[in-house]
């Protein structure tokens, strides 16, 4: 079995892009949500260095045309859709290019969550399960054990308050295909603590 995917979100500085990639991140997230303290302009994201890790844009309220335009300008590989976009929107971006966020706490049962995710079969590359009922980057965690029985038709990433002290437990219990790290590996919003990043990614990759 291959090692879980590791995404580090909220890139704002060149040294964090390079440091996270060197630590073993597979995906790096660039946020284009105006309400986020980690928000970048497309030009700012475009100016950050290219590394081996794939570049992911995080979008909440943008139109399809805006998403596609920013992806082109900032040279992004994937779009993480965090605004409840429907399957048609995802297909228009490109199923192989989309990570779509879901919020388990919006659902009364695991079956309800699974049904929503099933509607996106063939429309997205990865699902991402985040804490809360909207948005992300708030540092809250999901109930790992409650997700252990989830078997959606696509690979999924776990997000929400993950860092060096709980990411190994999250992987062991919830069994996602990967994890998304943000506030749990920061010294302040948008500024990564590379020691926390390295400790977290060692746990993810089993180094």
Model-derived features: positions:
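Conserved N-terminal beta1-alpha1 strand-loop-helix module at the mouth
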Residues: 1-207
